[in-house]
Every structure is written in C-alpha cells, then in structure tokens.
C-alpha cells in the first residue's frame, strides 16, 4: 500500500554472492517495505498483448489496483494506474478500436487514454462473482444501471484537496467546507472527467413535463412531477436525480445540491410518472447566527437529470 514501486535492473553473474541495501523512509503510518525480484522472462508481455490486440475482433482489457495500492487509512500516491498499465491501454486502443477498458479499482484514476477506448466500465472491487457479472453486462444479458457515487476528475490538480494535501505533521484540513464532491466542481467551474451520478445503459431515457404540483405529504412544502420514458429498444433502469438551486441566494451555499433520487424500471417505449416531495429540511441551511435550520425566502429551482452535469429539465417555485 502507499508509494509507487521503485524498479531497477541489476546484472548478476553466476556463482557470485551480492549484498543489496534497501533504504526507505517511514512517515508515521503503516511502516512496511516489500522487496521482490522478477525472474528473467523470455516473453515480452507488452509485445504479446499488443500482438493479440492487433489480431482480435475486440478486446476486453481488465486493469486496476488491489489492496497493495489503495486501502482504508492510507492515501494513494497518485491517480495513475500502477506500473505500465496506462501505456498498455494506450497501445492496445491504438491497435484495436473495439477495446473495452474494465477498471477494477476502488477509487477514481486519471485516464489519459479516455478518448481512445470504445467503452469504459468502472467495476470497483466486486468480489468472487466479478467474472460472471462482467460477462453478463458485456454480452447484454444484463443492462447496467449503476451511477457513480463520486466525481472522477480529469487531473489530480482538479480535486478539492489538491492545494492542502498532505498537510503538516500528518494532519490535513479539508478546507472546501460545504463544497465537497460535485459541489466543488460546480463552484470552481471545473469540468470533470465523469460527473457524480454518471452511468451507462444499453437504452436511452427521455425526461419531460417537469412541473410543480401540490404536495401531499404532511411535512412537504413543495412537490414536483415528471415523466420519464424508455426511448430505446431494450428494458432498462434509470436513476432520476433531483437537484435544488437557490436563485440569487444571499447565503454562501452550493450552487446546487442533490435532494432526491429514484430508480425506475421501464420496458421499451414505456413511460412512468415520478413525484419528488421536498420538506423544509431539504431546503434549509444552517444559520450559525441563530443556531438553527432555516429556509431562505427565495426562488427555488428544481432540476432533474441523469448526473450532476446532465440536467434534462428544470422548473421553479417561490418559498419562504
């Protein structure tokens, strides 16, 4: 876990004994060092992979990390894939335009090759049924419907913690405050690589007729209804996300905040109505002056979309 590996080549002569000195620095957490040697290999694995890619109809290229690279209580040294995996992806994609890159990682990574891959699947660390699940998705037995629970940045320097990491004396302050996650990218007007809430499907969905309706819940102060239609040819599931913006807010608050979401299953051509009800708490901010949650009198814009940046419909109401 932790730092990138340091590699070097040493020529050994048969029958001689050698002494090696390995130096490393302990920074106060998880003191450990791993030492290993790779036996000479008559095969050039990069050349073998690219040769196969050149001849194949399509390529499923599985890359990623494991607990040696990312784990709880420890930070990754960079967002690059370990070793020469990025180089491998670049070369394979250049040789075969039908390359599906499968990311078996536990967190975002940089993707210099993003425009070269035909498709990219973020599979996280799915466990022992990974192979069966992956084949079901790739061969269309199952239509994927997951959404990203975090933002994938284009570069490490785009992340909220970049300017303050690693802190001092093993302590780091998260200075973005309320603007965590997608809220940071909204405020700084930084385009992510893949937005919070982004996902793939073999079908398409149309959002329409978003409107304010009378709330039915006893604690609701606003309600919105919309229609969603499966406009494709296969069964699919969509997670409709509802965000709230405050027009001309006098409070230092995020540009928009996810307040509601609902997963809906639709056959080809089928439409359903979805209703989102909002309570005072959904619209409140914490007043440090009054030490209480309060609703700011303002125009509240309700947006629905397929991700934090893929907004399909919006409408507004005045509250307060």
PLM regions: where:
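C-terminal non-catalytic regions of proteins with extracellular/luminal or membrane-system context
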Residues: 1-320
